[in-house]
Design a protein with these regions (language model features):
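CN hydrolase (nitrilase-like) catalytic-core segments centered on the catalytic cysteine
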Residues: 67-91, 158, 167-251
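Short polar catalytic/cofactor-binding loops
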Residues: 10-17
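A short C-terminal boundary segment appended to hydrolase-like catalytic domains
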Residues: 258-275
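Extreme N-terminal starter segment of soluble prokaryotic enzymes
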Residues: 1-7
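Short beta->alpha transition motifs characteristic of CBS
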Residues: 47, 53-54, 110, 121-128, ...
């Protein structure tokens, strides 16, 4: 892995997609101005609706992923244009895409290169379900789970990717080995985030001896839902290099090849695996 600068964007997305697109572009531009080579957006950046079903009306067909695409898809076009205009690799959080099942969308992470062409995607596999403490979430009611474990590489760097609830399943990331950087857009609830977010992120970094970039939703949304925030960049030893507790903003950190190799050489746990 070559050394590079990564950024995590944190948002408090609203019910208005156009406002969210403007905010996304402004924050990615800010990250680029801070020297970021890669920028990761949070889950659900285009829309945090008042109801889980709101995203169905905004689901897009998957376009051909090219800058000169013939069909206009609002969210995908915004991501492509922003990557090209800012000269960054843009990991596009998640956007709602049309699925084969009526009443459900795919919750999809799209990756764009510096020319604005799509170079990867991943449909979220593990769907969040939680009830208790006056809260209930059931993503499976409105989202169709993906079937394919991601295999991504950008700038000749092998990557792992997951979305939010995927973080709780270590075998999901083991299935993506080998990789040097793990990217995770999320919208953790305040309840689960306060209890487990940092613990899980640092654990994934340590057990995979990799950098972790995690972008979150972070604040109170119009639905009354409160997301935990605390976007983080973590090194392969589990040290937190940067974090943003709440509110919109950008954090940056350098992903250093020497640091990665040092950790893996001094404690070659990945080579010692028996299972």
């Amino acid at each position: 892995m070559r050394s590079l600068r990564a950024a995590a964007v944190q948002m408090v997305s609203s019910t208005d997609p156009e406002t969210n697109i403007i905010t996304m572009k402004r924050l990615v531009r800010k990250a680029a101005e801070q020297g970021a080579d890669w920028v990761l957006l949070p889950e659900y950046w285009p829309l945090m609706g008042k109801n889980d079903t709101d995203k169905l009306a905004f689901a897009e067909p998957l376009d051909d992923g090219r800058v000169d695409k013939t069909c206009h898809t609002r969210f995908q076009t915004a991501l492509s244009e922003t990557a090209r205009e800012c000269g960054v690799v843009l990991f596009g959080g998640t956007v709602p895409l049309q699925s084969p099942n009526a009443g459900k969308v795919m919750n999809t992470m799209l990756v764009y290169d510096r020319d604005g062409n799509r170079v990867g995607l991943y449909h979220k596999m593990h769907l969040f379900g939680f009830s208790g403490l006056g809260e209930r979430y059931a993503e499976a009611d409105t989202i169709l789970a993906g079937n394919d474990v991601p295999k991504l590489s950008v700038d000749d760097v092998p990557l792992a990717a997951g979305v939010c609830y995927d973080l709780r399943f270590p075998e999901f990331f083991r299935a993506q080995q080998p990789f040097d950087v793990l990217l995770l857009p999320a919208a953790f609830t305040y309840t689960t985030g306060k209890a487990h977010w940092e613990l899980l992120l640092r654990t994934r970094a340590v057990e995979n001896q990799c950098y972790v970039i995690a972008s979150a939703q972070g604040g109170l949304h119009e639905s009354g839902r409160r997301t935990f925030g605390h976007s983080m960049i973590i090194d392969p030893w589990g040290d937190v290099l940067a974090t943003l507790p709440e509110g919109e903003g950008v954090i940056c950190a350098d992903l250093d090849t020497a640091r990665l190799q040092s950790v893996r050489t001094r404690l070659p746990a990945l080579k010692h695996r028996l299972l």
